[in-house]
């Protein structure tokens, strides 16, 4: 074996099996391209991406690890999201969530996003 080499079985690998998914339409209302990585909490992506943020809470892009989706200015596209797994805690990013995704009261998270000008928060 070579250091860093992958030895993969010759069979299909199923990712995110059994996790909830969602197709969501996203528009880049900004004047610059925005690239979103595979494991970024989609609710907290760039404030100029407009979509239903409440529906996207606790989800990430359903794409292979290490890849990303790019949204050009004025572009609208539909992406598939998948539930975040693991401990389901989010810290950092745009500093909106900062804690467990499954807490009962999320009103302060949505309020903060709206106050900071994130599009798609009612």
Swiss-Prot record:
GO terms for molecular function: urease activity. Its EC number is 3.5.1.5. InterPro entries: Urease_beta-like, Urease_betasu_sf, Urease_subunit. It comes from the Bacteria. One of its GO terms (cellular component) is urease complex. Pathway: Nitrogen metabolism; urea degradation; CO(2) and NH(3) from urea (urease route): step 1/1. It is found in: Cytoplasm. Pfam families: Urease_beta (PF00699). It catalyses: urea + 2 H2O + H(+) = hydrogencarbonate + 2 NH4(+). Keywords: Cytoplasm, Hydrolase. GO terms for biological process: urea catabolic process. PANTHER family: UREASE. Belongs to the urease beta subunit family. HAMAP family: Urease_beta. Heterotrimer of UreA (gamma), UreB (beta) and UreC (alpha) subunits. Three heterotrimers associate to form the active enzyme. This is Urease subunit beta. It comes from Acetivibrio thermocellus (strain ATCC 27405 / DSM 1237 / JCM 9322 / NBRC 103400 / NCIMB 10682 / NRRL B-4536 / VPI 7372) (Clostridium thermocellum). The lineage of its organism: Bacteria, Bacillati, Bacillota, Clostridia, Eubacteriales.
């Amino acid at each position: 074996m070579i250091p860093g080499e992958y030895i993969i079985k010759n069979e299909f690998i199923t990712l995110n099996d059994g996790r909830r998914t969602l197709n969501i339409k996203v528009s880049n209302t900004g004047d610059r391209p925005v690239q979103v990585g595979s494991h970024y909490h989609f609710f907290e992506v760039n404030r100029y991406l407009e979509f239903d943020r409440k529906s996207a809470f606790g989800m990430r892009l359903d794409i292979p690890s290490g890849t990303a989706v790019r949204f050009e200015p004025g572009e609208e596209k539909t992406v598939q999201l998948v539930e975040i797994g693991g401990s389901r805690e989010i810290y950092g990013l745009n500093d909106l969530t900062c804690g467990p995704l499954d807490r009962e009261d999320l009103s302060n998270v949505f309020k903060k996003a709206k106050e900071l000008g994130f599009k798609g928060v009612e």
